Amino acid sequence: MKNLALSSMQPKPGHFYAVGIGPGSPDLLTLRAASLVENCDTVISPQAKGSAKSIALEAVRPFLKDQEVIVHNYPMQRNRAKTQQRWQELADDVARRCDAGESVVQVTLGDPLIFATSSYLMQGLSEKLPAGHIHVVPGISAFQTTASRFGEALTLQEDRLMLMSATDISAVEQALEQCETLVLYKAGGCIEQLMELLRRRDLLQSASLVSCGEQGEHELQLADLSQWRVEPLGYMTTMIIRIGSRPWLEE
């Protein structure tokens, strides 16, 4: 999708807004995100399968008025055909609402364009809504939240920053050779394999992680993975590995 419309503070009838709401704390929404949630007709929020509540919905609850609120269990399976079919059904519903003149906001944790459900929904809407009726509002991402916990720069001067999913360990090992700072999303489900890789590469002390950042008592921080003790980690676990730094380019 190209040439998306610029978004304003006030939602327009018949328009769709993919709104990043940050890591899950209401005070980390941008002013634009809060205003769109507060003034739209319909709010759509994701909820992980098996979860008792939607983290994204709880984060925007202080800004809700009398909008219709829809909570969806979005498809997270690896069956491409079934996943695409479900996203198409969701896109059809949003398109019907927009055709009826509703302003629709889909809230998503983090940023709508980084490992986010919004990206799938926007793909389905791209041929259903008129040009200029799809908007993206950026949000604070998980890797920014994780970095803020430890106060160390992610990249300086010529350093290369790479962001990827942690689920393919062989790809992670290759990435360690291609950047100075590596950010891994979805690290909780493969933490033991990651620990073994980092141990073998002597990088445990150079790696840190945050699980469930900005989610109150559920948050776990670890500044040095050599101190990690085996315990379950959530899906929303982000790891930062600082591999080194590149020499400055002198004039």
Specify the residue positions occupied by each region the protein language model found.
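Glycine/small-residue-rich loop that forms an oxyanion/phosphate-binding "nest" at active or ligand-binding sites
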Residues: 71, 75-102, 106
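Conserved Motif II region of HX4D acyltransferases
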Residues: 98-121
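A contiguous loop/helix-start segment that scaffolds small-molecule binding in enzyme catalytic cores
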Residues: 16, 176-251
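Short acidic active-site motifs
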Residues: 32, 93, 170-172
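General beta-strand structural signal in soluble alpha/beta enzymes
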Residues: 45, 71, 106-108, 136-139, ...
